[in-house]
Amino acid sequence: MAKVCHTTQKHPHGQRSLSPLQYNALLPYGAILQEGGSNRADGVQFVVFSRHATALRVLLYDTPEDIEPAEVISFDPKTDRWGDVWTVFIPGLKHGQLYHFQADGPFDASAGHRFDPTARLVDPYSKALAGHFLHHEDGIIRPPKSIVIDDHFDWQGDRHLRHELADTIIYELHIRGFTASPSSGVAHPGTYLGVIEKIPYLKSLGVTAVELMPIHEFPQESYAGHRRDHENYWGYDPIAFFAPHQGYSASTEPGRQVTELKQMVRALHAADIEVILDVVLNHTAEGSGDGPTFSMKGLENSVYYMLENDSGDYRNFSGCGNTLNANHPITSELICHCLRHWVHTYHIDGFRFDLASILSRDRDGILHKNPPLIESITEDPLLADTKLIAEAWDAAGAYQVGTFASSRWAEWNGRYRDDVRRYWRGDDNQTGNLATRLAGSSDLYAGEQRQPYHSVNFITSHDGFTLNDLVSYNQKHNEANNEDNQDGDNNNYSYNYGIEGSTEDAHLTAIRGKQIRNMLSTLFLSQGVPMLVAGDECHRTQQGNNNAYCQDNAISWFDWNLPVVNADLLEFTKTLIRLRRNNPTLRRRTFLQGGSSECGVIPDVEWFSPDGSHVDWFSGEPSLICFFGAPTVDQLTAEDDPAGTPQHVLLFCNAATEARQFLFPSSPVILEMNWSIAVDTRQSHNTIPAAAPLKFESSRPVMLPERSLLCLMAPTTSTFGK
């Protein structure tokens, strides 16, 4: 039987000589407003927001497995409430203390109130959770317990790396999926520590940042929307925004995930690799009206969620049953505190915001022109050096690619993904679109003080086909998700080249391999910031599943045999990354202006048709020559001297289904350059640059077989290196 104590009474954790009001009066005002359970010198301060609660309690537990609390402490509404903030100091408690909140109040769904006095509630400001969701025969769900954490850690001088966004190469990975396979050979598979063991691989690949799929705490099974009772492998149904996922800890000790995540970040930073978090700040795992109550819904539903004005039903812009009321001052404050927490406590370098357009919506779901939350994040001084990347759309039709927020924000460029896929698939009239994407997507980002690096270029992401499957399947194959193959996107711009799925056919395998190399080459030779998905460098497959959100198995896991079996593609990818990192011409800080080399000057970009003449964008020709002129010394200086040796770039692309004869551009400026082959997808593997420069003549054609790419580079006299 739990012991219930009022805060004005003595209790087992320490004898009070002061009233609760006197205790709170001794604390700095900022401490009172620091929500959550905070360690103090001689106890723990609990702070929680609720506007309409009539009573609040903190339930204290001894172990994560406890069904009933060891003690229940009631807040005194007369002395422990400051406006809508409830706060109580309990002496004698210390870090490691487990707790829930419990709140009394009205249940009136039409008015937005869903208080349940029996519900055990996770603290929205929990810094860590312990235990699992417990299901009782009566249908009640008990969530994990919140933990008062010990925040001490020896960072050994670690600081944020602050790589320039324009120089960033992102690698998207799932903490568990990266090392869960037995083939990983790590001591701690599927964990933060497992990632540490694979840092040499990341370092050899050459990426500068890892973008981690959600690591904030989430239930292992989904309670949201139509996906209820499915495995929540991806983690896009959060329950505690501030808390690292305990399932990724190698230790079962409560709170140990805090230390292990810090160890991982410290180790990645030591390898000069930044850490970007994919944060889901648009909904929670509490689902819709018939979903469970285990946190915000039971504390202040009417504030935290977007609700229909007449019925109190949940607005569903996330596709997951509910939507955070992100621009309400209380919710906005929580989100900003959350981001600061990750930056300050874990040294996180940046964030990718899932369904970021939701963060621009007001309580009625209307898109703000100047959303208060976005402005708060943009102007937050602690986030000033933090990378901000928006997935600039949502599940209700908002699409803000190219128009999201301000110059502080980069964006996942969905147009880049679609246009590159369509060009190399051979769709009609895609050459102009390819050129626009190669040059940094000025059609999307040339305004609002933006530059090419505001475009995060990707061809695949966790959400959709892998690169291998993009050239192996015409349709999605999500039967393993048990949703009758109704989930996942139907519009993938994929092509199997004759046989659906895997094949031993050598000719077909060669075509698919070439198309993968074509798209990888395009990605790393484009202006903007490239993002590679873990495994695309070595033919990882999901067997045609383009929505593997619930597949915690070999469908999703990284198979560590692949880098060995497909070492040629891995080395090809490493070469592309090395070429990009060594050549500032591919990492321009400003948009290209164009020009003509026939005038005797070197333009920053020039476009040619296969016959060597200037391109006719309306011809429907599926082949293209692109010239990127190297930046001048003055331009490099103005761009803060990016690392590497600037080289001119000449790119030949042939998406046609037959061989094409390309004439070298006749401009003397281009002809006289000392060209060497840098990338050649005509071969079955990457061609290393020739030892001696190659001489080309305008009258001698360059032959490109069907669906192939050739990239030449020529040196200048300017060398920069940081």
Segments the model singles out, each with a brief description of its role:
Residues 50-52, 79, 92-94, 105, ...:
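Short, flexible loop/turn elements at secondary-structure junctions
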Residues 108-112, 179-181, 218-222, 283-286, ...:
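Short catalytic/ligand-binding loop motif for oxyanion handling, primarily in non-cytosolic enzymes
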Residues 169-171, 210, 275-277, 351, ...:
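Hydrophobic faces of well-ordered beta-strands that scaffold small-molecule active sites
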Residues 126, 347, 360-363, 368-534, ...:
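Conserved alpha/beta catalytic core and glycan-binding cleft of carbohydrate-active enzymes
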Residues 174-193, 197-348, 355-382, 398, ...:
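Substrate-binding/active-site clefts of carbohydrate-active enzymes
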Residues 1-171, 176, 197, 202, ...:
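Carbohydrate-interacting/catalytic domains
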Residues 83, 96, 166-168, 234-239, ...:
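Short, solvent-exposed loop/turn segments at the edges of secondary structure
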Residues 103-158, 220-237, 271, 291-315, ...:
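Core domains of carbohydrate- and sulfate-ester-processing enzymes
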